[in-house]
């Protein structure tokens, strides 16, 4: 096997794509800062029990594992940064007030999430800790939409769901409790025939409710239908009330409801959301409330947040235009060096041509050139 080959679904990021990704990262992190979010940088590697604390079985399967040569304990390469940031809030910062944190970094997956998906997403996200009210959920959703708008995605759909609906149904039926994991999988796939089969022995009320969930999607009127078609259990009523409130708080966003879109069900504790762009079947951003993750670190805190994959976002954007630059000759003369330093301080890209490579441009388009005239270095347009 050639030694330059990489593992399946792992790829180098070349200059044009890398520039798009980095520009996106800077714009989004700067926007997080404007909302008051503090940047944290968790390690790529942690003890496995800490890394998987509060996470579901799916996260365990997605995590690369290895043995620490120093301690002999099992380590994990992070597959998601949410738990790490919750650990920082609960154990290291240990604040009593509301805390807003953001992050960006690579994560690794044992298997890709889709046919052409990378196993090394570049995750970026934000979290609010310490406030259980819907105001925090609404802010996180606003921040996610604003981040995508800055990236160039303005025609998006905010899809709302709530884990409380399914959990209330399951808690009300002993047979359903045994099949919780399977029900979650079938509902996400909207596999109605399989749902009909697995719910055959359930109570009639539970069965009708579970079979109704895949069809309960659409605009805000879905909530009215849900109140009619689902049992009036306290957990369901509370979840539908919260979704109605979040819909009203979403302003002019294009909001839809999908009571079977249960991504993150295993560790989410309340309202969830996914954001879709036209022409793509998979969400470009996901988020929601997960109040119990901090319990694993000895300090339960209300929490809500979202994350996105910068690589995926960059891939959806148009090819970046080549960056304008100034070509300068190679030389160490004081006047030339002074001029180049001044231009770079002013934000100009100045590329000094090495001898024999005067016409190489690569990622940059040199539309101007630095020339010596009458003892002064001046800029002239090319072409």
From Swiss-Prot:
Is-annotated flag, keyword Lipoprotein? no
Chain segments annotated as coiled-coil in the UniProt record: none
Has UniProt tagged this entry with the keyword Acyltransferase? no
**InterPro entries associated with the record:** aa-tRNA-synth_II/BPL/LPL, HisRS-like_core, HisRS/HisZ, HisZ
Q: Superkingdom, according to UniProt?
A: Bacteria
Location(s), subcellular:
Cytoplasm
For biological process, the GO terms are: histidyl-tRNA aminoacylation; L-histidine biosynthetic process
A GO term from the CC aspect? cytoplasm
Pfam families with a match to the protein in the record:
tRNA-synt_His (PF13393)
Primary site of residence: cytoplasm
Pathway assignment reads: Amino-acid biosynthesis; L-histidine biosynthesis; L-histidine from 5-phospho-alpha-D-ribose 1-diphosphate: step 1/9
* Alphabetical UniProt keywords: Amino-acid biosynthesis, Cytoplasm, Histidine biosynthesis
Q: What GO annotations for molecular function exist for this entry? A: histidine-tRNA ligase activity
Q: What does this protein do?
A: Required for the first step of histidine biosynthesis. May allow the feedback regulation of ATP phosphoribosyltransferase activity by histidine.
**UniProt family annotation:** Belongs to the class-II aminoacyl-tRNA synthetase family. HisZ subfamily.
Q: What else is known?
A: This function is generally fulfilled by the C-terminal part of HisG, which is missing in some bacteria such as this one.
How it assembles, according to the record, is: Heteromultimer composed of HisG and HisZ subunits.
**Would you tell me the protein name for this molecule?**
ATP phosphoribosyltransferase regulatory subunit
